[in-house]
Amino acid sequence: MLYKVSDLFDLTHTRAAELLEKCEYPHEVLPRIKPFILALGETLPISEFLHPSPTVWIARDAVVAPTACLGECIIIDHGAEVRHCAYIRGSALIGRDAVVGNSTELKNVILFDNVQVPHYNYVGDSVLGYRAHMGAGAVTSNVKGDRQPVVVHRGSERMETGLKKLGAMLGDYAEIGCGAVLNPGAVIGRGAQVYPLVSVRGTVPANCIHKGGSVVEKREGGTRRRGGYGTFLEPKKVPKKAVCDVKVNWIKTGSGPGHPRGREELESLGLE
């Protein structure tokens, strides 16, 4: 099944909850972002938000670098950080404690709380869920080369969106590696990971890893650098003596981690 809003996002971590609740599929929110921000901005208390221009609202405890460029129709929430030379073109709702880094460009987006797009990212016509992170240089491509409307698909399922501009939908805790390209209409499930330099089309299922040539499920016992979605177990603890015994055996037998016997010994300890 194609991912719905409820499959990707915990709506307690965004001011756009009311808007997203009205949408079954996440891409349906994109044409509604601008009017929603304008209406929401008028309700924000002046005791908490600065109002430097008619359509821009910035939380008083947010940090916006003097070299950042802000367009129109923008809300920057509490604790967010917009770093030097960031370019927020417009229609952007930036959540609490989010990070928008140097030379990052945003356009028609919702960033949930704690999202990080910290270095040289382009995020357009997209929604990034709670604690989603994009590595340096990772981008969302939001227009097809033939300029035709974008189709969202997962396996054999397809949905015509009617949108000529549609970037990516990142579920909560999605992790995108450096230099990755998320092609128009890409959907990254909750807790999913995309390796660096990978070009993603279609949908990456929740709690899976897109390695480029293959998509695999995350293993129990794996770790994540940042807080995770679902059940992620702590790494298996292996007695130091057991590891030392394996290494001594490698020396005696001339094997090692690249040798079939060596790999078997590592697997017996629950390691690779």
Describe every region a protein language model picked out.
Residues 57, 75, 93, 169, ...:
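ABC ATPase A-loop
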Residues 60-103:
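Glycine-rich active-site/cofactor-binding loop and its immediate structural neighborhood
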Residues 1-55, 191, 197, 206-208, ...:
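Terminal amphipathic alpha-helical/low-complexity segments used for targeting or macromolecular assembly
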Residues 17-18, 111-113, 118-235, 244:
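Glycine-rich hexapeptide-repeat left-handed beta-helix
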Residues 73-74, 80, 91, 104, ...:
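Pentapeptide-repeat beta-helix register
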Residues 44-48, 61, 157-159:
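Short gly/ser/thr-rich secondary-structure transition/capping motifs
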Residues 94-114, 118:
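Hydrophobic, well-structured mid-protein blocks that either form specific transmembrane helices
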